[in-house]
Amino acid sequence: MTSKIIVALDYEKEAEALALVDQIDPSLCRLKVGKEMFTTLGINFVKQLHQRNFDVFLDLKYHDIPNTVARAVRSAADLGVWMVDLHASGGLRMMEEAKKILEPYGKDAPLLIAVTVLTSMEDLDLLQIGINASPMEQVLRLAHLTQRAGLDGVVCSPQEVEILRNACGEDFKLVTPGIRPIGTDFGDQRRVMTPTAAIRAGSDYLVIGRPITQADNPAEVLRSINVSIG
């Protein structure tokens, strides 16, 4: 699997999600399952995606006491997902315990990624929760904390990629939502970029939802994006 594209499955019904999944090639993307779908459909849905040979990013953004998060991460590893995430704002100890619990899995452990600042958040949103810093300042602070904890990388907006790449090095994975091909709606993302621009900036993986899932021909859009990013 070499594709950098992660397709976000944001559906209410299993049948609708699988109808989309059955139109696309697992060699051209991975799939992201978030809170809504996982809460509704559970682990059996993830298993169905695995049966179709898709790698799965389990996007549940764990944020709790260290022991609880570590156990949840272990459960995700047992499920066989490719990537799982947690909130860096849960703190260093929470992240360290989550990383440590994956050690017995060796090369079969999922990538463990931290969420820094949600891409919908702006300066005012941070100020309202007591953080007197710009989104970029907070992202950089949490990315350094994530790296200190030994995690594999962070989720960040495309505009933050170049700074994070320089600050954290080439081996630190950068997963970027807020990806919109030219001519598509920005939706509820506030900090967005085209796929080509994001890859040039240094993104490792691009999370793309509606531009693919709501397209008349999802397979063709996916193929086109893969071609555009090389």
Curated annotation (Swiss-Prot):
GO cellular component terms listed in the entry, alphabetical order: cytosol
InterPro entries: Aldolase_TIM, OMPdecase, OMPdecase_AS, OMPdecase_bac, OMPdeCOase_dom, RibuloseP-bd_barrel
Keyword Lyase belongs to the record: yes
Catalytic activity: orotidine 5'-phosphate + H(+) = UMP + CO2
MF terms in GO: orotidine-5'-phosphate decarboxylase activity
Gene3D superfamilies (alphabetical): Aldolase class I
Annotated residues for binding of substrate: 10, 32, 59-68, 119, 180, 189, 209-210
Keywords on record: Decarboxylase, Lyase, Pyrimidine biosynthesis
Pfam families linked: OMPdecase
Family the UniProt entry places it in: Belongs to the OMP decarboxylase family. Type 1 subfamily.
EC number: 4.1.1.23
Active site: K61 (proton donor)
Quaternary structure (record): Homodimer.
Function: Catalyzes the decarboxylation of orotidine 5'-monophosphate (OMP) to uridine 5'-monophosphate (UMP).
Protein name (database record): Orotidine 5'-phosphate decarboxylase
Superkingdom assignment: Bacteria
The protein's annotated pathway: Pyrimidine metabolism; UMP biosynthesis via de novo pathway; UMP from orotate: step 2/2
UniProt keyword annotation of Ion transport present: no
PANTHER family, per database record: OROTIDINE 5'-PHOSPHATE DECARBOXYLASE (PTHR32119:SF2)
Alphabetized CDD domains for the sequence: OMP_decarboxylase_like
UniProt-listed GO biological process terms: 'de novo' pyrimidine nucleobase biosynthetic process; 'de novo' UMP biosynthetic process
